[in-house]
């Protein structure tokens, strides 16, 4: 699987917890609105722009996507989001109910979809089209695609070493999940490990 570092647009450390939100499709409009209330840096203003409109108003998708873009621009303008100067991999660990999961935040090549990157279920065309329009309006991929692969001892050893460093982010979300992220400043050390992944399966983020 071809996986690459990238110039991330990411939160500054002191705003990471406030910006962090669950995936857009696991909460209702009412739940997202309640969670974002009084939190101007909540990323729900980007991923769930419907909450910016009066309750009961069904704003056209085009207006919602433009509202999302305005919210993203505001977060960048005020300095809550910053761009990495060079391409970087990120090592990401989350701990839920005592069980850790590790992964890499990176970019993969869409040309590998259908061969090296495989889906596990069918998706709805209307949802796919809406997400495409959302990403196009933002000119930014605001939510990750979640890929799974088999455990690898070389990756585990790499993670064990990297996790000795001070993380960029380390916070516990309201749902009790702890999120920790380390930048991998030497991508040439990680790249050979990722190149040996034979295939990956799309677990989420494709709707």
Give residue ranges: language-model regions:
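A cross-family signal for N-terminal binding/gating loops and helix N-caps
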Residues: 1-207
